[in-house]
């Protein structure tokens, strides 16, 4: 009896903003690694999430949502997403199942033009699709592009996610174990900490404020008593945004700090001392030097 081959590879997750890419990956990993919010364009960088299955390893790549870029930051985000479909073994193209497929057809054809890797269309949020319309919508997507498979899932409830993972694993080539099996991601803890703080800003503030913030971890040190001391700066573009982030009598900054600290403590499994500062950094989202300084290269 022949030994089962080990399958592994890189799988890019792409789609419009707010279709549930990060939520899906968190569900697959069984851990909250990717930040999420109900606002579009929460994800800014490509982040790898490593999922080990019996007989294989899947390296998922979470990407920013594909949208019309205005600032240099937006262009960076879109470039991150579009470049991720090259050189991978498989692509998961995520769509909101509740959206009319005809509205997505043009974007799908444009993004996947010239792509060599097989593509699975993942229809997310199927719990929001009216009864009786699911098969019709799947058929419409099938006329748009020669997808390898069309899979309906709900990242929120978990419906269909395990079947998706099994399908992905089966389509990957034979290959090595790229990462140790106890590694969840290839990004450092400092990056994840900055993302957690940014997520709280997205969840607690509104309008242009979350889109105008960049979080930089200035120091990350473990003290002799085991407490991790973290200092981070929240960069904004205008004085008015700084005032909103700080809030009346510092209340908003306190809420951001408390919620961030609690999640960072769960992540690091230790006590955390978190110090947050707010700085006005001008129009940083359109400044090449600052974008590089803040990690958007």
From Swiss-Prot:
Native source organism of the sequence: Geobacter sp. (strain M21)
Region named G3: 62-65
Span list, region G5: 153-155
PROSITE patterns for the chain: G_ERA (PS51713), KH_TYPE_2 (PS50823)
Stretch list, region G2: 41-45
GO CC terms in record: cytosol; plasma membrane
Membrane topology summary: Peripheral membrane protein
Subunit structure: Monomer.
Protein name: GTPase Era
A molecular function (GO) term: GTPase activity
InterPro entries, per the entry: G_ERA_dom, GTP-bd, GTPase_Era-like, KH_dom-like_a/b, KH_dom_type_2, KH_sf_prok-type, P-loop_NTPase, Small_GTP-bd
Keyword rRNA-binding in record: yes
Record-level GO BP terms: ribosomal small subunit assembly
Family: Belongs to the TRAFAC class TrmE-Era-EngA-EngB-Septin-like GTPase superfamily. Era GTPase family.
Keywords: Cell inner membrane, Cell membrane, Cytoplasm, GTP-binding, Membrane, Nucleotide-binding, Ribosome biogenesis, RNA-binding, rRNA-binding
Region described as G1: spans on this chain: 15-22
Every KH type-2 domain range: 205-282
Compartments where found: Cytoplasm; Cell inner membrane
Function summary: An essential GTPase that binds both GDP and GTP, with rapid nucleotide exchange. Plays a role in 16S rRNA processing and 30S ribosomal subunit biogenesis and possibly also in cell cycle regulation and energy metabolism.
Domain Era-type G span(s) in chain numbering: 7-174
Stretch list, region G4: 124-127
Binding site for GTP: 15-22, 62-66, 124-127
